[in-house]
């Protein structure tokens, strides 16, 4: 949003930024280290996504579960036997900041994997929160951003980048930023 504000305030002749960056969602990610031999067989492989539904119809509060020690085996190599790292993601666009507890996460894990993990099996936890993450960007938004990039390109010495241009995810943003920087050289 800041870059878009700067472009608008610069009053560049012919530049018409027809882009409105959508409001993001408050997100919480709870990562649990658990001693759970029952997870050694990876009941949900690397993880799963939970389809959106009205809050009162959801079987779980989480929107995703990642079995990090299956997704990235090098993590498992760093941990004691039968220790697993599970990351649960909470928060959806248009909803209030999610209330996240270890107890609630263990219920979600049981529902999603069929594995019951006792609270005493949780050996560590980390809760990270942030606001303003972008929702999935629709094609019409991407078209508007593309048109804005076309307007900025002839100015020389300026490239647009960031999640609002490249899409979400570090890989998308980094590769887009590198391409933009290369175009400036």
Q: What spans do the regions from the language model cover?
A:
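Mid-domain catalytic core of redox enzymes
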Residues: 1-86, 91-98
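Conserved flavin/dinucleotide-binding core of flavoenzymes
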Residues: 65-185
